[in-house]
Amino acid sequence: LLSRRQRQMCIRDRGTFKGLDYFKWAKEMDVVSWDNYPSYDTPWSSIAMTHDLMRGLKDEPFMLMEQTPSQQNWQKYNSLKRPGQMRAQSYQTLAHGADTIQFFQLRRSVGGCEKFHGAVIAHVGNENTRVFREVAQLGAELESFGDRTLGSRNEAEVGLIFDWDNYWALEYTSGPSEDLKYVDQIHQYYQYFYKKNIGVDMIPVDAVFSKYKIVVA
């Protein structure tokens, strides 16, 4: 429990876990954030949808708390990001409403469960690596923007309802099929608009629908 004395403390959360209604929880949060760790075969539209969900939780810009500049741990393949991939993913994050781009981790671990996770500074310990140069380049580009993009809002014509009650009803029951996954179904709707370059807001069931030309439920 955080006391009233800690009024200057910023409260945030991260992730997209099934067990908690994020729209309800976001009302108690100061800032919404999440960690973007796609697999080598994760569709770009899936990443974009999660960005839009994070933005939609408070209808405000969010924070990207973590991404790896290179390879990432705890997946089937700890694949290394190709040249330019991290930069492209970072700009995708900004385009979908993020105010920050942050990395985990700064320096490569020498042990522990994330010893194979990527880092800005590799074991070689200097700046003479492709990954370090790419991060430095991105930092310089973002610095050149100043504060022009901070607090900016996305104007979407489509509202796509993401409802945790339906999420739970579908996946916490024994039917109609274990292969029917809520997020995958929502992504199919989202992907249609993504491929046509149509902006989407991920919204709760009690959102104001009148601002949208189309609401998908």
Regions found by a protein language model. Give the residues of each.
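Distinct, well-ordered alpha-helical segments
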Residues: 15-26
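Single conserved hydrophobic/aromatic residue that forms the stacking wall/gate
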Residues: 1-11
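Carbohydrate-binding surfaces of carbohydrate-active enzymes
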Residues: 8, 26-217
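Short, well-ordered beta-to-alpha junction loops that form the rim of enzyme active sites
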Residues: 13-15, 163
